Amino acid sequence: MLIVVSPAKTLDYESPLVISRFTQPQLLDHSAELITRARQLSPDQIASLMKISDKLAGLNAARFAQWQHDFHPDNARQALLAFKGDVYTGLAVEDFSDGDFDFAQAHLRMLSGLYGVLRPLDLMMPYRLEMGTRLDNSRGKDLYQFWGDVITQHINAALTAQGDEVLINLASDEYFKSVRPKALKGRIVTPVFKDEKNGQFKIISFYAKKARGMMARHIIKHRLTEVEQLTGFNVDGYYFVPEESDAHTLMFKRAEN
């Protein structure tokens, strides 16, 4: 069973590391090609393309300029420790054991606009390049065309290495669009999290993102390897709803307090 999650815009390169081991990203040649293209953008162009402030655009122009192919602990950080956002609040890796990191390294992948696919211990330099960014490049008009089948092939290889064929989709729509279902050698299962508001259950982005992280943590902490085991997820008030679930969707709901 392989889990995919989205990255986060917010990064943390300051907090003490809870693990010193690291690995190298596996798609750096592709990343370097994107960096070469991104370096052609002025801060004003970055601000317009990414719809961010001038200050953030300047920061990311500097990050593109400083990026280098040689990753080491002095200029990079393990991806699972670098990302900070709602999903990663739910993952809460601060108390992960060595065994937890080992299981995560085998079963968790982070999709990325710049790095394609990252394993938890893969080093990454700071960046901002969301998968939905319409950055024209040598392979097409946006990052989906740039990555093409590369991400899907990489996921297929990871599934084959596990001897498994189940992909647990805990990523956002923006990022999961980089995976091509028809080329995927496996079954996609998507947990959905709905919260009650004013008597109606709906997907509330902030809560859903955190819940995806909590589900990933639950799988890692309990070493789950079968889809059926996910139905036991009952963290933070969520409960499984079998009548709204099927072979491809697992529905979880949480009642209003």
From Swiss-Prot:
InterPro entries: YaaA. GO terms for cellular component: cytosol. GO terms for biological process: response to hydroperoxide. Coiled coil: none annotated. NCBIfam families: PRK02101.1-1, PRK02101.1-3. PANTHER family: PEROXIDE STRESS RESISTANCE PROTEIN YAAA, PEROXIDE STRESS RESPONSE PROTEIN YAAA. Belongs to the UPF0246 family. This is UPF0246 protein ASA_3634. It comes from Aeromonas salmonicida (strain A449).
